[in-house]
A protein has these predicted regions:
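Pre-Walker A-like glycine/lysine-rich segment at the N-terminus of P-loop NTPase domains
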Residues: 1-49, 60-70
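Beta-strand secondary-structure signal
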Residues: 5-7, 19, 80-84, 110-112
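Generic "edge-of-domain/loop-turn" microfeature
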Residues: 13, 27, 90-92, 120
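Accessory nucleic-acid engagement/destabilization modules that flank
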Residues: 22-24, 28-31, 50, 93, ...
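Beta-strand elements of well-folded, non-transmembrane domains
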Residues: 24-26, 85-89, 115-117
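Conserved P-loop NTP-binding catalytic core
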Residues: 42-104
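Conserved ATP-dependent motor core of P-loop NTPases, especially the RecA-like helicase ATPase domain
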Residues: 105-130, 136-141
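Conserved small/polar residues in nucleotide/adenosyl-binding loops
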Residues: 145-152
Length: 152
């Protein structure tokens, strides 16, 4: 799995970084002093930190908007970091083993972390194919395919 891009929103002084591409060989963050380079890397680190490090809404949400935005929405479910990962062959095989053949064949997945600490992962899947695979493995699935319709 390889990081291909990330986006930081409503974290410290960064309202929306837009999508930042990560090149396979070298990626540089260039900007003036106090422009948010370290903030971007800090948010990316908190997606999956080595040591227990979570977002603290009161400290990490942009201060000048914290009170106003807090009246309008639940800030604990805001996602300050979102990253896109390209899957390698081993990852695709693991997905196939977990979900069944043909259910998930994404080239990339998107993962994020909310202020409340909840991580989420979006994997595009074919729900119909998943159900067909699950029914094929069930001993009574033959009844669903072979029984005549009530109108016959």
């Amino acid at each position: 799995m390889k990081l291909t891009s990330f986006r930081v929103r409503r974290y410290k002084n960064v309202l929306d970084s837009t999508e930042v591409s990560v090149e396979p060989d070298v990626t540089t963050l260039v900007g003036m002093n106090e422009s948010g380079k370290s903030t971007m890397l800090d948010a990316l680190y908190r997606l999956n930190p080595v040591y227990n490090d979570t977002f603290v809404e009161r400290d990490d949400y942009p201060r000048w908007r914290w009170k106003r935005d807090g009246r309008k929405e639940d800030l604990s479910v805001v996602t300050p970091i979102e990253a896109t990962f390209e899957l390698d062959q081993d990852d695709l095989v693991a997905l196939q083993d977990a979900l069944g053949e043909g259910v998930a064949t994404p080239e990339a997945i998107v993962a994020g972390r909310r202020y409340n600490g909840e991580r989420w992962i979006h994997v595009p899947v074919d729900e119909g194919r998943f159900l067909r695979n699950a029914l094929d493995e069930h001993p009574c699935s033959c009844l669903l395919y072979t029984s005549p319709s009530p109108r016959d």
